[in-house]
Each structure stands twice: as C-alpha cells, then as structure tokens.
C-alpha cells in the first residue's frame, strides 16, 4: 500500500505542477487516460480444480505449509483490482465465481469485452502460481516467469514491462527467461492467452511446490511485492502505450 500511496502523491504533484487554469483539464485528461483501457485480471482455477495445491495440502508431506492455488490467485487478483481501481484505472476480475470456470468460458468473457470496446482497448493478465511436480514431494524448481502466445504480438511488449518489474521487485530471486526468440518471455499455447483477441499474458509467480518459494509467496512481504510488481508493470506499460498513440 505504501507504493500505491506514493504513486498517488506523485500523480497529484504532476497535476498541481501545472498552471492553475490548466488544473481541471489536466485532471480530466489523466483520468480519461487511466480509464481508457479495460484491464481484465484472471484468477486462475477454482475450488473444484484437482491438484493445484502444495505437497502438504495434497499429501500431508512436511513442512506444514498449506496452500490452495485458487485461494492464493484470488487473494492476489482481488487486491490488484482494488488498488488499480483506487488509482483510477478500469480494472475488473474476469472470474467472480469460486468454482473453476472453463477456459472456453473465460476466453468468451474476454472476447466479449474485445468486441464491445475494441481489442486494442483491452488487456488480460492471468495470475497463477507455478508447480513442477504432482504434489507428492517438494521440488527444486524455483523462480518467476511470464508466458505469451506463440509468435510476435503486443503481448510480448506487455511481458517486457513485467520482466522489468520482476527484476526490480524480485532482485534476490530467480527470474526465468527464454531468449530463444529474441525476447525475454516464455511462449506457450495456453488456451486463454492463445484464443483471446486482445493482448494477454500469464504470470507464474514462483513455485508452490518449492519450500523457499512457497514461504515467500505466502508471506505478507511476498504478497505485497507480487501485487506491487503487477501494478508497476501494468501502469508502466499503459503509460508507454499512451505515449505511442
């Protein structure tokens, strides 16, 4: 929250630095810009999704670190949407249900916004935590990464801002890159980022079957850093996007 307050203060300083007779116009323009793009936040999985939990929650393997991905995804997504809206952006949860909404239905929801608002006025961020194994043991894989669909798209540009933010907030953690196609993000044919009409990325926020990673992402500090990282990436991307228009 400290970073959000800081952003608000910086925003107000920018506004009040203008001439007094320009204040109203500047404020209107800034608020119009911030609400121009629909930011859809997808909280992956649901209460009825099989697996998607720590080895302790799956089979009782020590250490005792309970974790259900659907709960964690929703906690991060809820706070992210709240804080983006608080600073004037048009952010919305894609899934408000607690059950697992199918990928087809999620994609249809996104594409409905694309048809109504124009696909260039919508972005999708799908939030997940990662896993290497099947929940029967603690694994060694660690780190943060983001995925886009195959090929060169605007999604790659969004991912660049996420990797920049990840390097800032997770400087002491492993960042997982794939430079084989000339950019930093990983690519995959994941249904929701492949079939949505708008730019879309999927973030994998460390491994819940790695002991050190799960301790981090379930801590107050870890959650705060993950939320702040997403906010910084989204805001910086949109500010640069506006400048290119």
Question: What name fits each language-model region?
Answer:
Residues 1-20:
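Short, low-complexity, charged amphipathic interaction modules
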Residues 19-109, 133-134, 140-142:
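Active-site histidine-acidic residue metal-binding/catalytic motifs
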Residues 36-37, 86-91, 117-124, 172, ...:
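Loop/turn elements at helix/coil->beta-strand transitions in domains of secreted/extracellular proteins
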Residues 39-42, 126, 133, 178-245:
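Active-site-adjacent mobile loop/cap segments within catalytic or ligand-binding domains
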Residues 45-48, 96-101, 129-135, 151-154, ...:
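Solvent-exposed loop/turn segments at secondary-structure junctions
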Residues 74-81, 104-107, 156-163, 190, ...:
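Extracytoplasmic/secreted envelope proteins and their assembly/folding machinery
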Residues 104-120, 190-195:
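Mature extracellular/periplasmic domains of secretome proteins
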Residues 155-183:
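Active-site-adjacent substrate-binding region
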């Amino acid at each position: 929250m400290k970073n959000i307050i800081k952003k608000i203060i910086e925003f107000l300083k920018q506004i009040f630095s203008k001439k007094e007779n320009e204040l109203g116009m500047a404020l209107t323009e800034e608020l119009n810009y911030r609400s121009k793009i629909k930011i859809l936040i997808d909280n992956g999985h649901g209460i009825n999704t099989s697996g998607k939990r720590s080895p302790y929650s799956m089979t009782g393997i020590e250490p005792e670190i309970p974790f259900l991905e659907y709960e964690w995804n929703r906690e991060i997504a809820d706070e992210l949407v709240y804080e983006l809206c608080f600073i004037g952006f048009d952010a919305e949860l894609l899934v408000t249900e607690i059950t697992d909404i199918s990928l087809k239905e999620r994609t249809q929801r996104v594409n409905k916004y694309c048809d109504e608002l124009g696909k260039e006025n919508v972005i999708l961020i799908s939030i997940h935590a990662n896993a290497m194994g099947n929940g029967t043991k603690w694994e060694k894989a660690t780190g943060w990464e983001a995925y886009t669909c195959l090929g060169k798209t605007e999604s790659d540009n969004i991912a660049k801002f996420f990797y920049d933010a990840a390097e800032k907030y997770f400087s002491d953690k492993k960042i997982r890159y794939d430079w084989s196609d000339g950019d930093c993000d990983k690519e995959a044919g994941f249904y929701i980022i492949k079939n949505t009409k708008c730019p879309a990325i999927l973030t994998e926020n460390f491994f819940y079957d790695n002991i050190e990673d799960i301790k981090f992402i379930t801590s107050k500090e870890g959650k705060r850093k993950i939320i702040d990282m997403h906010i910084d990436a989204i805001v910086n991307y949109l500010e640069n996007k506006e400048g290119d228009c």
